[in-house]
Amino acid sequence: MQNRTGLILCALALLMGFLMVCLGAFFISWGSIFDCQGSLIAAYLLLPLGFVILLSGIFWSNYRQVTESKGVLRHMLRQHLAHGALSVATVDRPDFYPPAYEESLEVEKQSCPAEREASGIPPPLYTETGLEFQDGNDSHPEAPPSYRESIASLVVTAISEDAQRRGQEC
């Protein structure tokens, strides 16, 4: 009976808090229409009180759920401890399997410096802005075309495309 009464009181607190917030919002909108100071005072009292009641109802329902589930968790823990200690099953790796990931990384770390020293070839040159391969002989790339040249080439291509379209239509 006590559990049911607590549930009803919790639901009532949530409902009352929500209704008080809604009523306060209604009084604020009604007060701005009819210019009534009494409704504004009631609204500014109902809004914070409604929020406090609503939040207390939320926390109260959470507390009730935790205390109910705490009993279930205690029961499960007692059953688990009554069975005794858990045995953890492990699997040993046979020698014919490849090495573990961590072991393979250690082997690669040891072999990489030796390979670099043995080759003696420097890495290729790259540009500062990208990762394109840059030839050692061509140290100065050609300059981009001027604005007038690029516009002129665009106009020429547009005119040729337009002429092709007109030729296809006729």
Swiss-Prot record:
* Superkingdom to which the source organism belongs: Eukaryota
Q: What is this protein called?
A: Transmembrane protein 252
Q: Which GO terms describe its cellular component?
A: membrane
The species this protein belongs to is Pongo abelii
Compartments, as annotated in UniProt? Membrane
- Record's bilayer topology term: Multi-pass membrane protein
Which keywords does this Swiss-Prot/TrEMBL entry list?
A: Membrane, Transmembrane, Transmembrane helix
Tell me the lineage of the source organism. Eukaryota, Metazoa, Chordata, Craniata, Vertebrata
User: Which Pfam families does the annotation name?
Assistant: TMEM252
| Name of the gene encoding the protein in the UniProt record | TMEM252
Residues passing through the membrane, by range:
8-28, 40-60
Q: Looking at the keywords, is Membrane present?
A: yes
- Coarsely, its chief localization is membrane
Region of interest: Disordered: 112-147
